[in-house]
Amino acid sequence: MTTYLEFIQQNEERDGVRFSWNVWPSSRLEATRMVVPVAALFTPLKERPDLPPIQYEPVLCSRTTCRAVLNPLCQVDYRAKLWACNFCYQRNQFPPTYAGISELNQPAELLPQFSSIEYVVLRGPQMPLIFLYVVDTCMEDEDLQALKESMQMSLSLLPPTALVGLITFGRMVQVHELGCEGISKSYVFRGTKDLSAKQLQEMLGLSKVPVTQATRGPQVQQPPPSNRFLQPVQKIDMNLTDLLGELQRDPWPVPQGKRPLRSSGVALSIAVGLLECTFPNTGARIMMFIGGPATQGPGMVVGDELKTPIRSWHDIEKDNAKYVKKGTKHFEALANRAATTGHVIDIYACALDQTGLLEMKCCPNLTGGYMVMGDSFNTSLFKQTFQRVFTKDMHGQFKMGFGGTLEIKTSREIKISGAIGPCVSLNSKGPCVSENEIGTGGTCQWKICGLSPTTTLAIYFEVVNQHNAPIPQGGRGAIQFVTQYQHSSGQRRIRVTTIARNWADAQTQIQNIAASFDQEAAAILMARLAIYRAETEEGPDVLRWLDRQLIRLCQKFGEYHKDDPSSFRFSETFSLYPQFMFHLRRSPFLQVFNNSPDESSYYRHHFMRQDLTQSLIMIQPILYAYSFSGPPEPVLLDSSSILADRILLMDTFFQILIYHGETIAQWRKSGYQDMPEYENFRHLLQAPVDDAQEILHSRFPMPRYIDTEHGGSQARFLLSKVNPSQTHNNMYAWGQESGAPILTDDVSLQVFMDHLKKTCCVKCCLMC
């Protein structure tokens, strides 16, 4: 018999879905007492090499308020050629093309193994992909040269029919005309004045590309539509390569003590307007490269005086950041415009100081774009990360989807509260929309402009079935996820995932519900909720909310005697959850101390879009130990794991750190690894490096690589992440294990757990 752990794993691999609860409480009242809501982490484009797309369109329920897709949960009458919708119970006739179906000849969408299935839409034109480069020229020559080389490299990776455009900016904004032979021609705009899409259309003489009337059947291959500013790669490859090579640093002089005048806000506005006027609702990426903060015009984040530092968290808390609100408002308006027309905005920011990601974060967050942060464009971190944007699948197609929409349909007993992730609401009200909103709610449809195989949304549900209307024994609730998107091949595709879970009466079957708890998924779903709240609430308030939820969960599902904390026990399905919450409280997602606003925005951006595995690594980093006593092994993320004769490899998602213990570091300095008789030591030093390289080669964005040792300045990255079970206060305690004491006043996991148990038991007594 399959265990819940295996069931959860199989569902994630097949459907890209992880639920907080895999048996659902059958009434609204009982569901609210579960503390953690019924919710799911859903990866719309989960990679399935064994799932070839089907070359026909889905069969829909005929009821206009439903329109659910035929799926394995539907009841089928093969004789009468009828099927009953499992969401609204409407009986539907199969289309004539299904005349030959029978119990022995079922279409793929009725087979249980195809609970997720992808259809190819054969009608409508196939549009080319569009890439619009928006390049900051206010940077050092070395950085600009490296960026130019990376962009030239990317041109060679684009399909020949892809349309490309180029906008450069500094004090002025230049829109380059790429259709000119022999000369470089561009339109120059002032960087201090914003332009509406209509004004831009008139100034550039733009017109929308007409979309041909939708027709059924295979499309006749036509040359891709284009204009002077967006041209096919195959036509202007050489010209654009030369143009990029000739790009110079912004010519306007920068007086001493001043920052260069950088018009990022206007440049992005023109990019959004250009695509808005020419290719609305077509897959397009605006790829913006910035080397510093916007210092003039709409969207500016700091003045040009170098003596005035860019805002910090302290300034924002004291309401002393004069440009934040206005700058954020400008970029939010641009993000919403881009999301409406289905265009993606990527931001690649490389500088030693902040560049304004706090104000600009809504652009990638709302459009499903990438956010990359680094020190310089001339580092392997940026170069390899940018190259991975253009990763291709086994069929030679980019691993990216464009202009996606997600629609969710539910059984009558459950409704949708909202979604948290890289999406915007399409304001589609329906019978399955809950009045209680969580995240982006009040809708059953969302726009996801940019999708990758790991893009993951958190979807929150509300059980609405009343306590006095019991669900029959064996009843199941169903949810259908319908994702429509433009594939990188130009095809429109529809991926449909339909899942079902059992209902249970929480008064008589609480053990069944408890056994179905997915603590990993629940931790990520609650973390997303906490980070979403942290954007608008005070940090301490969010931590208090998180603590209250944890205490309530422990009281509901823990086993203990009144007023006896030592008796507290958690079943195996809940045992790791408090540990996840402990590390989440200490994480840079909720603790802004020692991080700039840009860094916090960057960390939160990635957490809100990554899948479960990567999100767990972000909350609780993985620690591996290498020593002579045995093969590499995972060890506790604890200060007791830091030993003199060990090498540690820590993966935090954003950093890959190799730490050499005191003895190992001394041997390395003495050069033992270079002596033939100490070859085993050389192998020991090399083992974590090889494992680190494996992670570095596969992750997006590429993590920062840190090689440090006992007493090294960068060892602080490890010391700040481990549980401080040994500190300067207890390092000489009797029976204390050996390890590295951490100089901190933070509480350890043990103290945290002791306090949690005590609080649960005492509060229980007070309630009794």
Swiss-Prot record:
Belongs to the SEC23/SEC24 family. SEC23 subfamily. Component of the coat protein complex II (COPII) which promotes the formation of transport vesicles from the endoplasmic reticulum (ER). The coat has two main functions, the physical deformation of the endoplasmic reticulum membrane into vesicles and the selection of cargo molecules for their transport to the Golgi complex. Required for the translocation of insulin-induced glucose transporter SLC2A4/GLUT4 to the cell membrane. This is Protein transport protein Sec23A. COPII is composed of at least five proteins: the Sec23/24 complex, the Sec13/31 complex and Sar1. Interacts with SEC23IP. Interacts with HTR4. Interacts with SEC16A. Interacts with SLC6A4. Interacts (as part of the Sec23/24 complex) with SEC22B; recruits SEC22B into COPII-coated vesicles and allows the transport of this cargo from the endoplasmic reticulum to the Golgi. Interacts (via Gelsolin-like repeat) with MIA2 and MIA3; specifically involved in the transport of large cargos like the collagen COL7A1. Interacts with DDHD1. Interacts with TMEM39A. InterPro entries: ADF-H/Gelsolin-like_dom_sf, Gelsolin-like_dom, Gelsolin-like_dom_sf, Sec23, Sec23/24_helical_dom, Sec23/24_helical_dom_sf, Sec23/24_trunk_dom, Sec23_24_beta_S. It comes from the Eukaryota. PANTHER family: PROTEIN TRANSPORT PROTEIN SEC23 (PTHR11141), PROTEIN TRANSPORT PROTEIN SEC23A (PTHR11141:SF7). The modification Phosphothreonine is found at T308. Gelsolin-like repeats lie at residues 632-718. Zn(2+) binds at C61, C66, C85, C88. It is a peripheral membrane protein. It comes from Bos taurus. The keyword Phosphoprotein applies. One of its GO terms (cellular component) is COPII vesicle coat. Pfam families: Gelsolin, Sec23_BS, Sec23_helical, Sec23_trunk, zf-Sec23_Sec24. The modification N-acetylthreonine is found at T2. It is found in: Cytoplasmic vesicle, COPII-coated vesicle membrane; Endoplasmic reticulum membrane; Cytoplasm, Cytosol. The Gelsolin-like repeat mediates interaction with proteins containing PPP motifs that include MIA2, MIA3 but also SEC31A. These interactions are probably competitive. The gene is SEC23A. GO terms for molecular function: GTPase activator activity; zinc ion binding. GO terms for biological process: COPII-coated vesicle cargo loading; intracellular protein transport. Keywords: Acetylation, Cytoplasm, Cytoplasmic vesicle, Endoplasmic reticulum, ER-Golgi transport, Membrane, Metal-binding, Phosphoprotein, Protein transport, Transport, Zinc.
